[in-house]
Amino acid sequence: MNTATGVIALLVLATVIGCIEAEDTRADLQGGEAAEKVFRRSPTCIPSGQPCPYNENYCSQSCTFKENENANTVKRCD
């Protein structure tokens, strides 16, 4: 495997693992809202059984309260 092929393979792997998807933004030289939205996570990244984020749309299905290994009730993706 040459260097170029290795770099391409690493970029593809990083994209798949991170579920990163580019979002269209306008140029913002002030560091405002557009600068913060260059990348966003795909809504299908969080698999079943993982903790729910604040925005439930990031779960693959829905969120429900479940008991974790410490007997605490937490929200998990279904």
Swiss-Prot record:
Signal sequence range: 1-22
Primary residence: secreted
UniProt tissue specificity: Expressed by the venom gland.
Record GO biological process: defense response
One Gene Ontology term, aspect cellular component: extracellular region
Record site: Critical for insecticidal activity: P51, N68, R76
GO MF assignments: calcium channel inhibitor activity; sodium channel regulator activity; toxin activity
Residues cleaved off as propeptide: 23-41
InterPro entries associated with the record: Omega-atracotox, Omega-atracotox_CS
Subcellular locations according to the entry: Secreted
Domain of life, source organism: Eukaryota
Keyword tags: Calcium channel impairing toxin, Cleavage on pair of basic residues, Disulfide bond, Ion channel impairing toxin, Knottin, Neurotoxin, Secreted, Signal, Toxin, Voltage-gated calcium channel impairing toxin, Voltage-gated sodium channel impairing toxin
Positions of disulphide bridges: C45-C59, C52-C63
Domain notes: The presence of a 'disulfide through disulfide knot' structurally defines this protein as a knottin.
Function field: Insecticidal toxin that reversibly and voltage-independently blocks both mid-low- (M-LVA) and high-voltage-activated (HVA) calcium channels (Cav) in cockroach DUM neurons. Also causes a modest block of insect sodium channel currents (Nav). Induces potent excitatory symptoms, followed by flaccid paralysis leading to death in house crickets.
Other remarks in the entry: This toxin comes from a male specimen. It is observed that propeptide sequences coming from male specimen are identical but have only limited homology with the female paralogs, but the reason is unknown.
Family: Belongs to the neurotoxin 08 (Shiva) family. 01 (omega toxin) subfamily.
Protein name in UniProt: Omega-hexatoxin-Ar1c
Lineage: Eukaryota, Metazoa, Ecdysozoa, Arthropoda, Chelicerata
